[in-house]
Every structure is written in structure tokens, then in C-alpha cells.
Amino acid sequence: MPNKVKINLEKVSRVFAGPSGERIEALRDVSLEVEEAYTPEGRDVGEFRVLLGPSGCGKSTILRLIAGLDFPDSGKVEVNGKTVEGPGRDRGMVFQKYTSFPWLNVADNIAYGLTIQGAPAAQKKETVAKLVEAVGLSGFEKSYPDRLSGGMQQRVAIARTLAVRPEVILMDEPFGALDAQTRGDMQALLLHIWDETACTVLFVTHDVEEAVYLADRIFILSARPGTIVEDVPVALGRPRDPAMKQTKEFHDLQDYVLACLRRAPGTGHVRVGV
């Protein structure tokens, strides 16, 4: 059974107006594909793809275009073979900034999308119960965001996204503001959830170690105007284990990705890891 193209961008460009009216070219002729594969048993398995590049290279803009929160000046953006015309239930997004509603507790934040969709109370209760356990927030259902750590707030954000069962999860540096230990815990949680749900993930980072550890393949972007300069396969086995970060295979791949970044036009600072 041939693989299915889940996300497709063809020659996408995006230009913004600067504060003084100057032309800021964020993306230029970006083309990429993210596929959905099939196991021998016929199960759909979404790819885990990473967008890696220096700050300001347009990674977040790509996610916003796929999410339907912004639109290209030229080119084509498709999900499941259909042109993206706005946000949809098939896509969910997790941001770096904490996005929990401060007036809602954990359970109600997780159920927010279902509430908007008019889901029955019984469905919301069952979904929240499963997700609270899945993301390790049991006992915090009635807590409010100001009582949660950064890692816990991102667990809420992931659970809220999963509650509406999207086919594609778009993640914009969701662990960038977390300390190293919490970031490692969240990476492990994300990989577990991805394995369980088999959804497609497109994850933005400027951390090379994080990219190599999480991804099936890595799209490497140049500095602004961002364009795809490399598509690097990550030939590491799954499930991933933190111990593999100490292996020669991992370090060789990390060095290769870093070299690709340094060869890319105009690239500056990227984080290698901690």
C-alpha cells in the first residue's frame, strides 16, 4: 500500500510588512511533504517530522500556514489533499507560550475544544479522565493554571489538543521554555503519545539534539527568507531512549545535522543541546 501525503507545501512564499512598511520576506519557495505510512497490518502511522533552523527563519510561519491561521502570498498548502482555507478539526496546535485559560481548571481546559464542538457531558468526562491519566496530571483536575508548573501547563496544552482527536499535531517549540529535566520528561511523554495515537506530528525547534532525538526526518531551513535546504532521515531505532543520546551513532548524526545548518545560507545561532 503506497504512503499517503498528509501535508503538502509547494513553492510557498510569505511576505510581511515591517513596522516602517518595509517588505519582510519570511518564506521563499518552500516545498515539503509529510507522509502517512502503513504498517504490514494496515495500520496508519503518521510521521514525526521536525522543522529545524535558526530563530526567525520562518518555522512558526510554516506551522501557522498549515494550521490555517495565516495564508501564503504564493504557492499551495494542502492537508489530506485539500487546500487549507482555515483552521479545522483535523489539525491541532501546541504553542511555546502557555495557552491555558486562567479562569478554567485543568479538566475544563482539556475539555474546552469538546465544549466548543457541543460534545455531550459524558463524552467530555470520559475523554478528560483518559487524558489526565495519559499526560500525568491525575489529582490536578481541579487545579488552575496559576498553580501549575511550566511543564504541567504544557501537559494540559497537549491533552487539550488530543481531546479533539486531530490527525495532525503542530508543535511550535513547546518545550523551549522548560528546564532540561522537564524538557526530557516532556519529550518522553510526547513520543509515548505519538506512538499510541499514530497521528502525524510536525515539531518546530532550533535545538539540534531535540530534533535528532524526536524525528523520523528533519527539514532544515536557511535563515530568512526561510527555505528548505536539507531533508535529513534519522536512522535511529524506535522506541527512542535517552541513553541513545550518548551513543556514537547519535553524536555522528547530530554533527551531520549541525554541519548542514552551518552550510545553509545565512544561518546563525542554533542550540546543540544541554
Predicted regions: what they are:
Residues 67:
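Helix-to-loop junction immediately C-terminal to a conserved catalytic motif
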Residues 75-86:
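Conserved ABC transporter NBD signature motif
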Residues 104-112:
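Short coil-to-helix segment of the ABC ATPase nucleotide-binding domain corresponding to the Q-loop/switch region
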Residues 158:
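Hydrophobic anchor residue at the start of the ABC signature
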